[in-house]
Amino acid sequence: MAEAVWSTDTGEAVYRSRDPVRNLRLRVHLQRITSSNFLHYQPAAQMGKDLIDLATFRPPQAASGHRPDEEEEEEVVIGWQEKLFSQFEVDLYQNESACQSPLDHQYRQEILKLENSGGRKNRRIFTYTDSDRYTDLEEYCQKITTSASEVPSFLAERMANVRRRRQDRRGVEGSKLKSRIVTWEPSEDFIKNNHAINTPLQTMYIMADLGPYGKLGYKVHEHVLCILKVDSNGVITVKPDFTGIKGPYRIETEGEKQEHTSAWKYTIDNVSSLAQPEEEEREQRVFKDLYGRHKEYLSSLVGTDFEMIAPGALRLFVNGEVVSAQGYEYDNLYVHFFVELPAANWSSPPFQQLSGVTQACATKSLGMDKVAYFSFPFTFEAFFLHEDESAESLPEWPVLYCKVLSLDFWQRYRVEGYGAVVLPATPGSHTLTVSTWRPMELGLVAELRRFFIGGSLELEDPSYVRIPGTFKGERLSRFGFRTETTGTVTFRLHCLQQSRAFMESNSLQKQMRSVLDRLEGFSQQSSTHNVLEAFRRARRRMQEARESLPQDLVSPTGTLT
């Protein structure tokens, strides 16, 4: 006798769907393999051979639509997270003392309603949903290999803990969380145990009670038919895959006696209802309208016209960040910073804020230094207009000044250091480290005052870090001014430059010149343009005066009398 065609591929299949998972419907057909249905299955597997058709030996259907022995075959349509109770759960939850959790009491009420309405629609096929304890325990005890003597590794245990829902730890509405959401000082073990990504999953098990007739309701006879997993991204994992055109899956059970040993076959089919053409068209129209409105919203934010600047001008746009400060004496640091624009040729838009103060930040030990991470963003823009055409004038660039202070328990501040750095003249991303210093007094009294009271010397003009704006001489002397080197401040700057000079690409020489040289060329072009415009106006006036004269005076052919 030929062997029947069974599906041996029990691996999982992955699907992706944008539709709500609640519309998923599966049809599970379970049947015991007996001599009659086994022979009936042979012709389908041996198509094209001269075999006797045994379909006539198939047992007739009963008037009720079921086979005479309802324990031999069952077919159920199951929805996503639909709960079908097993005989074991029915017997368990009928005893009120066995109900311990609110979910157990809910299951008890549902079972009592089913008993009053005529009983369950299923006999052997049942389900475990994402809320059941079986889902947590099965995922925690799941093996990675097929070895019977497998010992789970540390990584396997950690990943099992990541995937568990921890049903017993779900908080009740209105209760206070016992665990901290943010761990401010994580230990090395905490970092090692919590580095894995936890993707939210919902799991559902389709089970079958394959016990002998009249002995249903024992855990030992429960077998997994299918495992369904759905994550928040719409990825559906089915193990094993839908039967489709493949043969049915086979399960063999063993019992203490020969009559308790049996074989079963089952199929899993996707019977989810397809969307109607009208619904698909309506959905496409809704998505098209949604995307169109989102596109219009983005267009309204960007605008239709590209913002241009005047010829000979340069627009500097800076997205900056105060990254960190390290190497200072006291804790709880904050930074006061501002941008100074040169008085000549530079300007900023109205209501432009060129200064800022970071938040107070506690330091963290990093090697021998204490580092305070601010990650404080700031943004500003400025305009440069080249108007001075004298050869002796050199363009100046904006300067970023910073002042580092510390705050104690009584809200008293101390100056920890001053620093300054010239903004980069080239566009792109730049990371700048600014070294700072602070003025100091000699003697122990000054240090005691700084420690207990918090007072310290400060600069009246912060621009004294470089060249003060009020200085008009040729040489600046700081002789006798005592300072002490302190820590460093790290800035991250993303500089953007916009100018019409960048459009000049006629020759390699122009491409290699700096933007300031191009801006100077724009000023020369502007003066030449003014001369040409004045010549055109003079020529136009001459033509108007010529047209107003009599023709006999203008005509060169006239004769003298």
Swiss-Prot record:
PANTHER family: B9 DOMAIN-CONTAINING (PTHR12968), TECTONIC-LIKE COMPLEX MEMBER MKS1 (PTHR12968:SF4). One of its GO terms (biological process) is motile cilium assembly. It comes from Mus musculus (Mouse). Part of the tectonic-like complex (also named B9 complex). Interacts with TMEM107. Interacts with TCTN3, AHI1, TCTN1, TCTN2, CC2D2A. Interacts with FLNA. Interacts with TMEM67. Interacts with B9D1 and B9D2. Residues 314-442 form the C2 B9-type domain. Component of the tectonic-like complex, a complex localized at the transition zone of primary cilia and acting as a barrier that prevents diffusion of transmembrane proteins between the cilia and plasma membranes. Involved in centrosome migration to the apical cell surface during early ciliogenesis. Required for ciliary structure and function, including a role in regulating length and appropriate number through modulating centrosome duplication. Required for cell branching morphology. Keywords: Cell projection, Cilium, Cilium biogenesis/degradation, Cytoplasm, Cytoskeleton. It comes from the Eukaryota. It is found in: Cytoplasm, Cytoskeleton, Cilium basal body; Cytoplasm, Cytoskeleton, Microtubule organizing center, Centrosome. GO terms for cellular component: centriole; centrosome; ciliary basal body; ciliary transition zone; cytoplasm; membrane; MKS complex; nucleolus. This is Tectonic-like complex member MKS1. Disulfide bonds: none annotated. InterPro entries: C2_B9-type_dom.
